[in-house]
Design a protein with these regions (language model features):
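Bacterial N-terminal signal peptides that target proteins for export
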Residues: 1-10
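Pocket-lining segment of extracytoplasmic ligand-binding domains
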Residues: 107, 181, 187-276
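Conserved C-terminal helix/tail region of periplasmic/extracytoplasmic solute-binding proteins
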Residues: 314-340
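Bacterial signal peptide processing site
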Residues: 23-26
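Short, glycine-/small- and polar/acidic-enriched structural segments
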Residues: 29-175, 181-183, 199, 228
Length: 340
């Protein structure tokens, strides 16, 4: 991805997302006698990030201390706050000054931006070509997107699942109202899907890996077949980005470098803390996850071509009545390489 040319929206840096001290507002570690900022080594700024769990770049960075080292270089430290999951609740937490950094899709980002956001996006990862899509059970008579007519499909409202389904239907020339959308939280959908209470499930790799790895499900259509523009983005609380741009830039640099390493050696980023229990990925599911990650994108700056595709998604959501109007996504983007 090429860096953004100056965007008019970026002139208002105060509208950008944040990383701040643990508590109600940005603050330094009072034990160090700091002034709230990372400069001058007087205080340490605390960055609140959802706990990454057992896999991924942040999980390994948490374990080996490399993330602490990268943040310490700019006078910051991480506080693991809550757990990683769907973007909508994370966006609400950033708006309420309870979280500073979160990861989500452009689709869930757009719906969250339609609700008085206090955050902005500062990185982009290309749409997942193979790890997201529409799942059907093995043995299902659903052989094409057109076979979804009259069926029930589980989706997360306003997020990746609803986008993938609507995009697939539009591509097949099927009116959206000819397929019943069943709105469910993704972490509550597997049991419903496997019990046959829905016919298909539009979802991303976090949940698809276990289903495909079990041998009980397959993708009817993946991201490539659907023509997905569903980028993964990192968001930062706006006031934090305004006050501590150098920390946002350092976090980006860490994510960029290590996401490239993860793509080259996916297995090294799995089962970081344990290879047993519900957070571990083993057997066929591990093979599936490694294959997905090897084809995934890296964490990059947001470039002009990316913005065009974001705008396409925003227009599509407005046309499909997912959002009441087209969200001005460009007003909530940060050129991370120009922060200083």
């Amino acid at each position: 991805m090429r860096p953004l040319t100056p965007l008019a929206a970026l002139a208002a840096l105060a509208a950008l997302a944040t990383v701040t001290a643990c508590g109600g507002s940005p603050a330094a570690d009072t034990a160090t006698g700091g002034d709230g900022g990372p400069k001058g080594a007087k205080g340490t700024v605390t960055v609140r990030i959802p706990d990454p769990g057992n896999s991924g770049v942040l999980a390994l960075g948490k374990k080996d201390g490399s993330l602490d080292e990268a943040l310490a270089a700019v006078g910051a430290k991480v506080a693991w706050t809550g757990s990683a999951g769907p973007f909508a609740p994370a966006a609400q937490a950033m708006n309420a000054d309870q979280l500073d950094i979160a990861t989500g899709s452009i689709t869930s980002g757009i719906t969250s931006l339609s609700q008085s956001p206090g955050f902005a996006f500062f990185t982009a990862t290309d749409p997942d070509p193979v790890g997201e899509g529409i799942l059907v059970r093995e043995g299902s008579d659903i052989a094409s997107v057109k076979d979804l007519v009259g069926r029930k499909v589980a989706v997360n409202k306003g997020g990746t699942g609803e986008y993938l389904l609507l995009k697939a239907l539009a591509g097949a020339g099927i009116p959206a109202d000819e397929v019943e959308r069943v709105y469910l939280r993704p972490d509550q959908t597997a049991a419903v899907f496997n019990a046959g209470q829905v016919d298909a499930w539009a979802v991303w790799s976090t949940y698809a890996v276990a289903e495909i790895g079990s041998g009980k499900a397959r993708f009817l259509a993946d991201g490539t077949a659907i023509g997905s523009d569903n980028y993964s983005l990192n968001a930062v609380r706006s006031k934090f980005a305004e006050e501590h741009p150098e920390i946002v830039k350092a976090l980006y640099a860490y994510l960029h470098e290590n996401s490239a390493k993860e793509r080259k050696d996916p297995a090294a980023y799995l089962n970081v803390f344990t290879d047993a229990g519900p957070t571990a990925v083993n057997g066929k599911a591990k093979e599936v996850q490694i294959a997905f990650t090897a084809k995934a994108g890296t964490v990059d700056p947001i470039g002009p071509e990316d913005v065009k595709r974001f705008e396409t998604v925003a227009r599509f959501y407005a046309d499909q009545k997912v959002t009441p109007n087209k969200v001005d996504i460009a007003a909530h983007l940060l050129d991370v390489e120009k922060l200083s």
